[in-house]
């Protein structure tokens, strides 16, 4: 290897001596730039990279200022990017400051709670791991609660004691939660939402019981103390009963409208009142019945009764009989002494007696049937209806068959509804829903004249307006017809006068032309100036008449010229 390097340097030295000055300068520059590039690459690769303090951007400006102040107190150099991220130069220093900030809870809210365990240090202890676990669980629960629509902010504090050797000595896990309700939320008074929040916290933390959870609002009121919500529950129950009552009444009102609209027009009846009485109490009934035991069922093919029943079935029986017959004996006292038997019994001592006893015990089984019925908590116990029905309004006519006008309106007569029709309406209403008179249901239908004055006035105003418009159209049509007739007559007379004038002018022109021809034929000397001037004047007048006729009726003039050309041809 040493020989190789020796030969390499010898050959390089020989080549360098043989090279020209320009080549030597170029080679030196190349070597210089290569060395400079190597130095730059080595310096760049050994330079420490910026380490992000947290993997997420810090959007809260107040939190960002607190973190910056804490880093300044530790005399740490850091770089703040435009997106709210903090970068440090040393990775070890970043881990140290991250642990300090986590301990002082200066961590972004939207940061992953379990990112605390991404901190790798050789010197981390079990105590620090338990603290990190508690903080991660706390932050996870806070993020879970803040995600609810009814919570604006939350603060969770967990007490997780160390595991004891004996179960009896183990302290329970406890949690205190302070929430800030969102404006417009009813989580403070809504028991179901509070219970859901308790379940959410209980299931998120291992070993936590619902009795060890305290949830308060900003004023310090305990929300999960349900003993204070009994009054609110009663109010909610009353509100639900009211809404249910209104729902039943609306349904019944719709059924009545549907039933009455089939026999009456909508404007002829009015539902004055629909009252539904509800019983929301829960009622459970237990009954016990004894029925005969069926020994043989009814034969479906037999026309007579083949069914055999028994009141009971004997399970066991016991019969006992006792009989005794003999002389009764009344004992006396000691010998030589009179006994204590009363005198009335001493006379019966020599009478023979007879005793019979008969006893029969039977154990029977009865056909016993027990039933338990539970009524629905919301049932209708009474319905009362009040309905007004209007009669019929008919117009009043005079002897000529025209409307009778009274006070600027057409006169009307009211015809009340017959009692039979009212009874039919009540029958229709009774069949439209579950009508039960035994539970106190009542339906009242009364015939009352509705106030229709404004309605009639509007109808009559429209009627009179339409009549006036019809009369105006009639007069206008007559006037228009007369105008058309006048214009037609005027146009016909004008045409006739024009036709006569043209005929007269043509006749005069023809006579003048004949006179001129006659004069020319007679020698021409006798033609006077008046005849020539008159002929010129008549020719001009004839030309003007021809032009006027061509303007008024160009088609007739064209036909006349066409005919004249054909004749001359």
Curated annotation (Swiss-Prot):
Residues 281-291 have a biased composition (Basic and acidic residues). It is found in: Cell inner membrane; Bacterial flagellum basal body. The chain crosses the membrane at residues 25-45, 473-493. Residues 281-348 are annotated as: Disordered. It is a multi-pass membrane protein. GO terms for cellular component: bacterial-type flagellum basal body, MS ring; plasma membrane. Pfam families: YscJ_FliF (PF01514), YscJ_FliF_C (PF08345). Signal peptide: none annotated. GO terms for molecular function: cytoskeletal motor activity. One of its GO terms (biological process) is bacterial-type flagellum-dependent cell motility. Keywords: Bacterial flagellum, Cell inner membrane, Cell membrane, Membrane, Transmembrane, Transmembrane helix. Gene3D superfamilies: 3.30.300.30. Residues 295-319 have a biased composition (Polar residues). The basal body constitutes a major portion of the flagellar organelle and consists of five rings (E,L,P,S, and M) mounted on a central rod. The M ring is integral to the inner membrane of the cell and may be connected to the flagellar rod via the S ring. The S (supramembrane ring) lies just distal to the M ring. The L and P rings lie in the outer membrane and the periplasmic space, respectively. The M ring may be actively involved in energy transduction. Belongs to the FliF family. This is Flagellar M-ring protein. The lineage of its organism: Bacteria, Pseudomonadati, Spirochaetota, Spirochaetia, Spirochaetales. The gene is fliF.
């Amino acid at each position: 290897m040493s020989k190789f390097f020796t030969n390499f340097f010898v050959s390089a030295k020989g080549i360098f001596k043989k090279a020209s000055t320009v080549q030597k300068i170029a080679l030196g520059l190349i070597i210089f730039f290569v060395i400079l590039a190597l130095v730059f690459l080595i310096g760049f690769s050994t330079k420490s990279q910026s380490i992000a303090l947290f993997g997420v951007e810090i959007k809260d400006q107040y939190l960002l200022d607190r973190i910056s102040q804490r880093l300044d107190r530790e005399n740490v150099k850091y770089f703040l990017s435009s997106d709210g991220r903090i970068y440090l130069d040393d990775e070890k220093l970043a881990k140290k400051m991250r642990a300090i900030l986590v301990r002082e809870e200066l961590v972004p809210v939207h940061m992953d709670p379990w990112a605390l365990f991404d901190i790798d240090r050789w010197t981390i202890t079990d105590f620090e791991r338990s603290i990190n676990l508690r903080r991660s669980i706390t932050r996870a629960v806070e993020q879970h609660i803040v995600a609810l629509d009814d919570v604006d902010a939350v603060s969770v504090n967990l007490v997780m004691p160390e595991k004891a050797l004996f179960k009896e000595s183990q302290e329970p896990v406890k949690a205190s939660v302070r929430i800030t309700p969102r404006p417009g939320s009813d989580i403070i008074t809504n028991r179901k939402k509070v219970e859901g929040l308790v379940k959410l916290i209980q299931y998120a933390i291992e070993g936590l019981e619902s009795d060890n959870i305290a949830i308060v609002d900003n004023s310090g009121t305990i929300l999960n103390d349900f003993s204070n919500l009994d009054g609110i529950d009663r109010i909610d129950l009353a509100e639900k009963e009211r809404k249910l009552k209104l729902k039943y009444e609306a349904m019944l009102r719709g059924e009545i409208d549907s039933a009455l609209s089939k026999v009456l027009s909508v404007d002829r009846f009015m539902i004055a009142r629909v009252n539904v009485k509800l019983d929301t109490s829960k009622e459970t009934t237990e009954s016990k019945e004894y029925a005969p035991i069926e020994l043989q069922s009814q034969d479906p093919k037999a026309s007579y009764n083949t069914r055999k029943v028994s009141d009971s079935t004997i399970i066991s029986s016991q019969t006992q009989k006792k009989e005794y017959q003999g002389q009764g004996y009344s004992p006396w006292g000691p010998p030589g002494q009179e006994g204590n038997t009363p005198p009335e019994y001493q006379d019966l001592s020599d009478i023979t007696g007879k005793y019979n006893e008969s006893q029969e015990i039977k154990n029977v089984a009865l056909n016993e049937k027990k039933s338990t019925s539970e009524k629905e908590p919301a049932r209708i116990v009474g319905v009362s209806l009040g309905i007004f029905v209007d009669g019929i309004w008919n117009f009043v006519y005079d002897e000529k068959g025209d409307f009778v006008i009274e006070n600027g309106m057409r006169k009307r007569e009211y015809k009340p509804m017959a009692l039979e029709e009212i009874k039919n309406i009540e029958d229709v209403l009774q069949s439209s829903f579950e009508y039960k008179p035994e539970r106190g249901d009542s339906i009242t239908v009364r015939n009352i004249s509705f106030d229709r004055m404004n309605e009639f006035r509007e109808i009559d105003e429209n009627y009179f307006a339409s009549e006036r418009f019809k009369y105006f159209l009639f007069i206008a049509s007559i006037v228009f017809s007369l105008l058309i007739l006048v214009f037609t007559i005027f146009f016909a007379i004008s045409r006739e006068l024009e036709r006569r004038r043209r005929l007269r002018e043509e006749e005069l022109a023809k006579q003048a032309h004949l006179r001129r021809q006659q004069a020319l034929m007679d020698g021409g000397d006798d033609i006077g100036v008046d005849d020539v001037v008159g002929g010129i004047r008549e020719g001009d007048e004839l030309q003007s008449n021809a032009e006027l006729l061509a303007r008024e009726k160009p088609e007739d003039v064209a036909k006349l010229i066409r005919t004249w050309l054909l004749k001359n041809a």
